[in-house]
């Protein structure tokens, strides 16, 4: 059986993924699927630089800005939605292009995931409330009695993993690590992935990061986050990790000047981009790497990609 192909266009923030993907989609009548964990939320298209906020064309974009921040969502739910969209697009005879920089989503989509059952929102709330009441150390002590294997592998200071392990045991009666040792499930085993990694020269990347944040701050991002603050409680948007939200909230609360908020957001964006480059460099082995250090070289990338797609 000949496997169908999927293009994944990945790389650090502000590396030009959306621009290149848009041009490829126009040239080849492709459809674009989001693979960024923050661009799924409909309340924050500006601060996340959502391409459907930027491009107004007939190109089909999927899984962008479709979800409210209060809706229950998980990486497994994302994978199932993405797989459904990919299959629908290929049935129509078109090529799907996935664009984003969330390494976890890309890794699990390409290489498979441990099939841990979904945790109900009610149970998740119960465990979070328990944690808020008793704290990390006591929750870790309870986990040790229920799941001694997990307690030896999870530090009591690692709140996220601690809560997750406790949730999984309460839901399944099994250690979370029993799922880790089981064979991984590949949701798209009948597809081939062609991974293209955009890797700009560091100085050029940092420049584009700064320019993007400057543009975002001028492009009504302040109003967007002010509305978020007005419509939702801090608990409801605490899980939003997009750079710029925390800094704008500090500005709105009078704790930072606007210039200081922008400077901090730019610094954090550069740090985030550096971490993304490190992750993609070491975690994704089978990939095509496209490097550039100027706008002129960046313009040549499209021609290179068109050649790759023809090969």
Curated annotation (Swiss-Prot):
Annotated binding of substrate, by residue: 13-18
InterPro entries: Dimethylallyltransferase, IPT, P-loop_NTPase
UniProt site positions, description: Interaction with substrate tRNA: 102, 124
GO BP annotation list: tRNA modification
Cofactor entry: Mg(2+)
Catalytic function, reaction form: adenosine(37) in tRNA + dimethylallyl diphosphate = N(6)-dimethylallyladenosine(37) in tRNA + diphosphate
EC number: 2.5.1.75
Binding site for ATP: 11-18
Pfam families, per the entry: IPPT (PF01715)
Keyword line: ATP-binding, Magnesium, Nucleotide-binding, Transferase, tRNA processing
GO molecular function: ATP binding; tRNA dimethylallyltransferase activity
Family note: Belongs to the IPP transferase family.
Subunit structure: Monomer.
The protein's role, per its UniProt record: Catalyzes the transfer of a dimethylallyl group onto the adenine at position 37 in tRNAs that read codons beginning with uridine, leading to the formation of N6-(dimethylallyl)adenosine (i(6)A).
Protein name (Swiss-Prot/TrEMBL): tRNA dimethylallyltransferase
Source organism of the structure: Rickettsia prowazekii (strain Madrid E)
The encoding gene: miaA
